[in-house]
Amino acid sequence: MEEQEIGVPAASLAGIKHIILILSGKGGVGKSSVTTQTALTLCSMGFKVGVLDIDLTGPSLPRMFGLENESIYQGPEGWQPVKVETNSTGSLSVISLGFLLGDRGNSVIWRGPKKTSMIKQFISDVAWGELDYLLIDTPPGTSDEHISIAEELRYSKPDGGIVVTTPQSVATADVKKEINFCKKVDLKILGIIENMSGFVCPHCAECTNIFSSGGGKRLSEQFSVPYLGNVPIDPKFVEMIENQVSSKKTLVEMYRESSLCPIFEEIMKKLRKQDTTTPVVDKHEQPQIESPK
Protein backbone atom coordinates (compact mmCIF):
# COMPACT_ATOMS: atom_id res chain seq x y z
CA MET A 1 0.00 0.00 0.00
CA GLU A 2 1.43 3.35 -1.05
CA GLU A 3 1.60 6.02 1.64
CA GLN A 4 -0.38 9.14 0.78
CA GLU A 5 1.55 12.38 1.18
CA ILE A 6 0.11 14.75 3.78
CA GLY A 7 -1.83 17.56 2.13
CA VAL A 8 -1.97 15.77 -1.24
CA PRO A 9 -5.18 14.21 -2.62
CA ALA A 10 -5.08 10.44 -3.16
CA ALA A 11 -3.88 9.71 -6.71
CA SER A 12 -6.51 6.98 -7.09
CA LEU A 13 -9.24 9.61 -6.71
CA ALA A 14 -7.76 12.08 -9.19
CA GLY A 15 -10.14 11.09 -11.98
CA ILE A 16 -13.30 11.39 -9.86
CA LYS A 17 -15.46 14.50 -10.28
CA HIS A 18 -17.77 14.11 -7.28
CA ILE A 19 -17.38 12.21 -3.98
CA ILE A 20 -20.50 11.76 -1.85
CA LEU A 21 -20.80 9.95 1.49
CA ILE A 22 -24.05 8.23 2.49
CA LEU A 23 -24.55 8.52 6.27
CA SER A 24 -27.06 7.52 8.94
CA GLY A 25 -27.37 8.13 12.65
CA LYS A 26 -28.43 4.57 13.40
CA GLY A 27 -28.69 1.17 11.76
CA GLY A 28 -31.80 -0.19 10.10
CA VAL A 29 -32.83 2.97 8.25
CA GLY A 30 -32.08 1.60 4.78
CA LYS A 31 -28.84 3.49 4.14
CA SER A 32 -27.40 0.79 1.87
CA SER A 33 -30.69 0.69 -0.04
CA VAL A 34 -30.42 4.45 -0.58
CA THR A 35 -26.79 4.05 -1.71
CA THR A 36 -27.81 1.31 -4.15
CA GLN A 37 -30.70 3.30 -5.61
CA THR A 38 -28.62 6.47 -5.87
CA ALA A 39 -25.99 4.53 -7.83
CA LEU A 40 -28.56 2.85 -10.10
CA THR A 41 -30.28 6.17 -10.79
CA LEU A 42 -27.06 8.01 -11.64
CA CYS A 43 -25.96 5.14 -13.89
CA SER A 44 -29.33 5.13 -15.68
CA MET A 45 -28.91 8.90 -16.19
CA GLY A 46 -25.69 8.19 -18.09
CA PHE A 47 -23.05 8.81 -15.43
CA LYS A 48 -19.99 6.74 -14.60
CA VAL A 49 -20.49 5.67 -10.98
CA GLY A 50 -18.33 3.90 -8.40
CA VAL A 51 -19.53 2.65 -5.02
CA LEU A 52 -17.18 2.12 -2.06
CA ASP A 53 -18.56 0.09 0.84
CA ILE A 54 -16.71 0.94 4.08
CA ASP A 55 -19.27 -0.68 6.37
CA LEU A 56 -16.53 -3.15 7.28
CA THR A 57 -18.44 -5.23 9.84
CA GLY A 58 -21.65 -5.40 7.80
CA PRO A 59 -20.84 -5.13 4.08
CA SER A 60 -24.18 -5.58 2.30
CA LEU A 61 -23.58 -4.01 -1.11
CA PRO A 62 -22.33 -7.20 -2.83
CA ARG A 63 -25.75 -8.71 -2.10
CA MET A 64 -27.62 -5.56 -3.12
CA PHE A 65 -25.90 -5.56 -6.51
CA GLY A 66 -26.05 -9.35 -7.03
CA LEU A 67 -22.26 -9.74 -6.77
CA GLU A 68 -21.90 -12.15 -3.85
CA ASN A 69 -19.80 -14.64 -5.81
CA GLU A 70 -17.44 -12.03 -7.23
CA SER A 71 -13.87 -11.28 -6.10
CA ILE A 72 -11.50 -8.33 -6.25
CA TYR A 73 -8.47 -8.70 -8.53
CA GLN A 74 -5.14 -6.92 -8.28
CA GLY A 75 -4.18 -5.20 -11.52
CA PRO A 76 -1.10 -3.18 -12.51
CA GLU A 77 -2.75 0.03 -11.29
CA GLY A 78 -4.30 -1.42 -8.13
CA TRP A 79 -7.44 -3.26 -7.06
CA GLN A 80 -9.98 -3.55 -9.85
CA PRO A 81 -13.57 -2.63 -8.88
CA VAL A 82 -16.21 -5.26 -9.62
CA LYS A 83 -18.36 -4.22 -12.57
CA VAL A 84 -22.13 -4.15 -12.14
CA GLU A 85 -22.93 -2.68 -15.52
CA THR A 86 -21.37 -0.89 -18.45
CA ASN A 87 -23.65 0.48 -21.15
CA SER A 88 -23.38 2.97 -23.98
CA THR A 89 -23.73 5.95 -21.65
CA GLY A 90 -23.06 5.02 -18.02
CA SER A 91 -21.20 2.50 -15.90
CA LEU A 92 -21.34 1.15 -12.36
CA SER A 93 -18.66 -0.61 -10.29
CA VAL A 94 -18.29 -1.60 -6.64
CA ILE A 95 -15.57 -2.18 -4.04
CA SER A 96 -16.45 -3.87 -0.74
CA LEU A 97 -14.75 -5.86 1.98
CA GLY A 98 -17.47 -8.41 1.29
CA PHE A 99 -15.56 -9.44 -1.84
CA LEU A 100 -12.57 -10.41 0.32
CA LEU A 101 -14.43 -12.42 2.96
CA GLY A 102 -15.49 -15.34 0.80
CA ASP A 103 -18.33 -16.61 2.99
CA ARG A 104 -21.18 -14.25 3.90
CA GLY A 105 -21.20 -15.78 7.37
CA ASN A 106 -17.62 -14.75 8.13
CA SER A 107 -17.51 -12.09 10.83
CA VAL A 108 -15.08 -9.16 10.91
CA ILE A 109 -13.65 -8.67 14.39
CA TRP A 110 -11.18 -5.83 13.96
CA ARG A 111 -9.93 -3.11 16.25
CA GLY A 112 -9.73 0.52 15.16
CA PRO A 113 -6.17 0.51 13.72
CA LYS A 114 -6.92 -2.40 11.38
CA LYS A 115 -10.14 -0.75 10.20
CA THR A 116 -8.21 2.46 9.56
CA SER A 117 -5.58 0.56 7.57
CA MET A 118 -8.27 -1.12 5.45
CA ILE A 119 -9.94 2.20 4.67
CA LYS A 120 -6.60 3.76 3.71
CA GLN A 121 -6.06 0.86 1.33
CA PHE A 122 -9.52 1.29 -0.18
CA ILE A 123 -8.78 4.98 -0.77
CA SER A 124 -5.23 4.67 -2.13
CA ASP A 125 -5.14 1.29 -3.89
CA VAL A 126 -8.33 1.07 -5.98
CA ALA A 127 -8.06 1.77 -9.72
CA TRP A 128 -11.30 3.69 -10.17
CA GLY A 129 -10.20 5.47 -13.31
CA GLU A 130 -12.47 8.24 -14.60
CA LEU A 131 -15.74 8.56 -12.64
CA ASP A 132 -18.49 11.14 -12.47
CA TYR A 133 -19.53 10.02 -8.98
CA LEU A 134 -18.01 7.98 -6.17
CA LEU A 135 -20.59 7.05 -3.52
CA ILE A 136 -19.22 5.93 -0.15
CA ASP A 137 -21.54 3.77 1.95
CA THR A 138 -20.57 4.27 5.60
CA PRO A 139 -21.47 2.33 8.77
CA PRO A 140 -24.28 3.67 10.96
CA GLY A 141 -23.44 6.17 13.68
CA THR A 142 -20.08 7.91 14.15
CA SER A 143 -17.26 5.40 14.48
CA ASP A 144 -13.57 4.86 13.70
CA GLU A 145 -14.52 4.32 10.07
CA HIS A 146 -16.11 7.78 9.83
CA ILE A 147 -13.13 9.52 11.39
CA SER A 148 -10.73 7.61 9.10
CA ILE A 149 -12.65 8.35 5.91
CA ALA A 150 -12.98 12.03 6.83
CA GLU A 151 -9.22 12.26 7.37
CA GLU A 152 -8.37 10.33 4.20
CA LEU A 153 -10.69 12.41 2.03
CA ARG A 154 -9.86 15.82 3.48
CA TYR A 155 -7.49 16.78 0.67
CA SER A 156 -9.64 15.18 -2.04
CA LYS A 157 -12.42 17.69 -1.24
CA PRO A 158 -15.54 15.50 -1.15
CA ASP A 159 -18.80 17.20 -2.12
CA GLY A 160 -20.35 16.21 1.21
CA GLY A 161 -22.74 13.70 2.71
CA ILE A 162 -26.35 12.61 2.30
CA VAL A 163 -27.95 11.78 5.67
CA VAL A 164 -30.58 9.02 5.69
CA THR A 165 -33.25 8.79 8.36
CA THR A 166 -36.66 7.22 8.92
CA PRO A 167 -39.71 9.18 10.13
CA GLN A 168 -39.64 7.91 13.74
CA SER A 169 -38.31 10.18 16.47
CA VAL A 170 -35.79 7.55 17.65
CA ALA A 171 -34.09 7.74 14.23
CA THR A 172 -34.25 11.52 13.86
CA ALA A 173 -32.68 11.97 17.32
CA ASP A 174 -29.63 9.98 16.19
CA VAL A 175 -29.44 11.99 12.97
CA LYS A 176 -28.78 15.12 15.02
CA LYS A 177 -25.58 13.46 16.29
CA GLU A 178 -24.59 12.64 12.71
CA ILE A 179 -25.16 16.24 11.65
CA ASN A 180 -23.02 17.52 14.53
CA PHE A 181 -20.29 15.04 13.57
CA CYS A 182 -20.32 16.39 10.01
CA LYS A 183 -19.94 19.92 11.34
CA LYS A 184 -16.96 18.91 13.49
CA VAL A 185 -15.09 17.27 10.60
CA ASP A 186 -16.03 20.03 8.12
CA LEU A 187 -18.14 17.76 5.91
CA LYS A 188 -20.93 19.59 4.11
CA ILE A 189 -24.39 18.03 4.41
CA LEU A 190 -25.89 17.85 0.94
CA GLY A 191 -29.31 16.96 2.25
CA ILE A 192 -31.57 14.63 4.20
CA ILE A 193 -33.56 11.72 2.78
CA GLU A 194 -36.48 10.34 4.77
CA ASN A 195 -36.52 6.62 3.94
CA MET A 196 -39.37 4.17 4.69
CA SER A 197 -41.79 7.08 4.46
CA GLY A 198 -44.94 5.12 3.69
CA PHE A 199 -45.62 1.68 2.22
CA VAL A 200 -46.43 1.01 -1.44
CA CYS A 201 -49.13 -1.65 -1.75
CA PRO A 202 -47.89 -4.36 -4.17
CA HIS A 203 -51.44 -4.87 -5.46
CA CYS A 204 -52.86 -1.36 -6.00
CA ALA A 205 -49.65 0.75 -5.76
CA GLU A 206 -51.28 3.07 -3.21
CA CYS A 207 -48.82 4.54 -0.68
CA THR A 208 -49.89 4.45 2.98
CA ASN A 209 -48.09 5.95 5.99
CA ILE A 210 -47.35 3.08 8.38
CA PHE A 211 -45.04 5.14 10.60
CA SER A 212 -45.15 8.78 11.59
CA SER A 213 -44.01 11.15 8.86
CA GLY A 214 -42.24 14.46 8.43
CA GLY A 215 -39.29 13.87 10.78
CA GLY A 216 -36.71 14.32 8.03
CA LYS A 217 -38.36 17.51 6.79
CA ARG A 218 -38.39 18.98 10.31
CA LEU A 219 -34.70 18.16 10.76
CA SER A 220 -33.80 19.84 7.48
CA GLU A 221 -35.63 22.99 8.58
CA GLN A 222 -34.00 22.93 12.02
CA PHE A 223 -30.47 22.64 10.63
CA SER A 224 -31.04 24.66 7.44
CA VAL A 225 -29.97 21.82 5.16
CA PRO A 226 -31.75 20.75 1.97
CA TYR A 227 -34.55 18.21 2.19
CA LEU A 228 -33.98 15.88 -0.75
CA GLY A 229 -37.20 13.88 -0.48
CA ASN A 230 -39.02 10.98 1.08
CA VAL A 231 -38.80 7.38 -0.14
CA PRO A 232 -41.49 4.77 0.60
CA ILE A 233 -41.05 1.05 1.22
CA ASP A 234 -41.76 -0.82 -2.01
CA PRO A 235 -41.85 -4.65 -1.73
CA LYS A 236 -41.24 -4.86 -5.48
CA PHE A 237 -37.80 -3.28 -5.01
CA VAL A 238 -36.89 -6.03 -2.52
CA GLU A 239 -38.21 -8.61 -4.99
CA MET A 240 -36.10 -7.06 -7.74
CA ILE A 241 -32.93 -7.32 -5.62
CA GLU A 242 -33.67 -10.94 -4.70
CA ASN A 243 -34.41 -12.04 -8.29
CA GLN A 244 -31.82 -10.02 -10.21
CA VAL A 245 -29.41 -12.92 -10.77
CA SER A 246 -32.03 -15.01 -12.59
CA SER A 247 -33.43 -12.08 -14.59
CA LYS A 248 -32.63 -11.59 -18.27
CA LYS A 249 -32.55 -7.83 -17.71
CA THR A 250 -29.69 -5.91 -16.11
CA LEU A 251 -30.20 -4.42 -12.65
CA VAL A 252 -30.25 -0.90 -14.09
CA GLU A 253 -32.90 -1.91 -16.64
CA MET A 254 -35.07 -3.46 -13.93
CA TYR A 255 -34.67 -0.44 -11.70
CA ARG A 256 -35.82 1.92 -14.47
CA GLU A 257 -39.19 0.12 -14.30
CA SER A 258 -39.41 0.51 -10.50
CA SER A 259 -41.84 2.95 -8.85
CA LEU A 260 -38.88 4.26 -6.83
CA CYS A 261 -36.79 5.29 -9.84
CA PRO A 262 -38.72 8.54 -10.57
CA ILE A 263 -38.42 9.47 -6.88
CA PHE A 264 -34.64 9.10 -6.93
CA GLU A 265 -34.41 10.91 -10.26
CA GLU A 266 -36.03 13.93 -8.59
CA ILE A 267 -33.65 13.59 -5.63
CA MET A 268 -30.66 13.52 -7.98
CA LYS A 269 -31.92 16.62 -9.79
CA LYS A 270 -32.14 18.48 -6.48
CA LEU A 271 -28.68 17.27 -5.52
CA ARG A 272 -27.08 18.39 -8.78
CA LYS A 273 -28.62 21.87 -8.61
CA GLN A 274 -27.17 22.62 -5.20
CA ASP A 275 -24.94 25.54 -4.35
CA THR A 276 -21.98 23.90 -2.62
CA THR A 277 -21.36 26.94 -0.41
CA THR A 278 -24.49 26.56 1.76
CA PRO A 279 -23.46 26.34 5.45
CA VAL A 280 -25.05 24.08 8.07
CA VAL A 281 -26.84 26.03 10.83
CA ASP A 282 -28.98 24.71 13.70
CA LYS A 283 -31.77 27.27 14.13
CA HIS A 284 -32.54 26.02 17.63
CA GLU A 285 -28.99 25.97 18.90
CA GLN A 286 -25.86 27.44 17.35
CA PRO A 287 -22.77 26.28 19.26
CA GLN A 288 -19.39 27.45 18.10
CA ILE A 289 -17.60 24.30 16.96
CA GLU A 290 -14.04 24.41 15.79
CA SER A 291 -13.05 22.05 13.00
CA PRO A 292 -10.30 19.59 14.00
CA LYS A 293 -6.84 20.58 12.89
Swiss-Prot record:
The protein's required cofactors: [4Fe-4S] cluster
Main location: cytoplasm
Cellular component, GO, one term: cytosol
Top-level taxon in the UniProt lineage: Eukaryota
Binding site for [4Fe-4S] cluster: 201, 204
Effect the entry attributes to changing residue 86 to A: Loss of function
InterPro entries named in the record: Mrp-like_CS, Mrp/NBP35_ATP-bd, NUBP2/Cfd1_eukaryotes, P-loop_NTPase, YlxH/NBP35
Keyword hit for Protein biosynthesis: no
Keywords for the protein's UniProt record, in alphabetical order: 4Fe-4S, ATP-binding, Cytoplasm, Iron, Iron-sulfur, Metal-binding, Nucleotide-binding, Phosphoprotein
Keyword Coiled coil: no
Assembly notes: Heterotetramer of 2 NBP35 and 2 CFD1 chains.
UniProt protein name: Cytosolic Fe-S cluster assembly factor CFD1
Organism: Saccharomyces cerevisiae (strain ATCC 204508 / S288c) (Baker's yeast)
